[in-house]
């Protein structure tokens, strides 16, 4: 979301690339970073004082930040996604017509993304889930103003021209489905939690086996296998479908019958 740059260390040794710098110029509404040809506002900021021009994050990740904190939402997977390879050997794969799976509350949080067709959307990107939530703090501009709105989250996947398989969880808290031990385990924002209690603990509802298995499936399709396998998970094999789809345009005769 925020573009950053490196500077040497400030300890007197001057080691390269030791200090991470951002001026969050988007908030200022102008160029304030003293390095003239480098922008350290939001990647998406398209205003003329950005010397590098807009480079929205979804051009790489497939999704773009729109929902600000604090959110603690479940992930919803309707039956239309049940046949996707991503969900093989999960409860989602067994969904019937009209059914949907509602996965662990907190998977979507504390901030999350959408898939927007903003001119930078990667070609061939497709969805693996669909969750719509009302009354979220929704971005209104280049990264400074938020107001109540409705947003729809999707897990996404696409094949980059380099051959890389790019998965977009579009959420900070995907790890909540993998391991029950994490921060704000009850989903209560730290500023509202009991200051005398620990900030890191065991989520009483986590983890989520569906998320664990789907992640295992994803890694298998990327050519990565676990050294040891959790007992309740199913080994996953990589896809053998390596040919890209093709399309062709044919000119038909005027009297052709289809």
Would you name each region that the model predicts?
Residues 60, 65-67:
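Acidic, low-complexity intrinsically disordered regions
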Residues 251-258:
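Short, solvent-exposed loop/linker segments at the N-terminal edge
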Residues 2-22, 29, 68-244:
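Extracellular ligand-binding/catalytic regions of CAZymes and related secreted enzymes
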Residues 3-54, 59:
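E1/E1-like adenylate-forming module used to activate ubiquitin-like modifiers
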Residues 246-250:
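Low-complexity, Ser/Thr/Pro-rich intrinsically disordered linker/stalk segments at domain junctions
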Residues 42, 50, 56, 78-79, ...:
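Serine/threonine-rich low-complexity intrinsically disordered regions
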């Amino acid at each position: 979301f925020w573009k950053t740059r490196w500077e040497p260390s400030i300890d007197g040794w001057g080691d390269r690339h030791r200090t991470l710098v951002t001026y969050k110029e988007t908030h200022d509404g102008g160029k304030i970073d003293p390095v003239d040809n480098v922008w350290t506002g939001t990647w998406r900021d398209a205003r003329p004082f950005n010397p590098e021009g807009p480079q929205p994050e979804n051009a790489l990740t497939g999704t773009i930040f729109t929902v600000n904190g604090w959110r603690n939402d479940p992930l919803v997977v309707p039956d239309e996604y049940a046949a996707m390879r991503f969900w093989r050997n999960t409860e989602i794969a067994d969904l019937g017509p009209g059914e949907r799976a509602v996965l662990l509350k907190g998977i979507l949080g504390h901030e999350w993304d959408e898939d927007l067709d903003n001119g930078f959307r990667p070609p061939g990107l497709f969805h693996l889930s669909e969750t719509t939530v009302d009354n979220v703090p929704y971005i209104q501009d280049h990264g400074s103003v938020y107001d109540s709105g409705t947003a729809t989250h999707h897990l996404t996947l696409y094949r980059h021209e380099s051959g890389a398989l790019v998965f977009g969880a579009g959420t900070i808290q995907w790890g909540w489905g993998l391991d029950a031990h994490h921060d704000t385990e009850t989903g209560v924002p730290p500023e509202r939690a009991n200051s005398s209690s620990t900030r890191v603990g065991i989520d009483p509802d986590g983890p989520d086996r569906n998320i664990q298995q789907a992640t295992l499936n994803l890694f298998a399709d990327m050519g990565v296998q676990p050294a040891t396998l959790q007992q309740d998970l199913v080994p996953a094999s990589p896809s053998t479908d390596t040919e890209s789809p093709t399309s062709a345009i044919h000119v038909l005769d005027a009297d052709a019958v289809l």
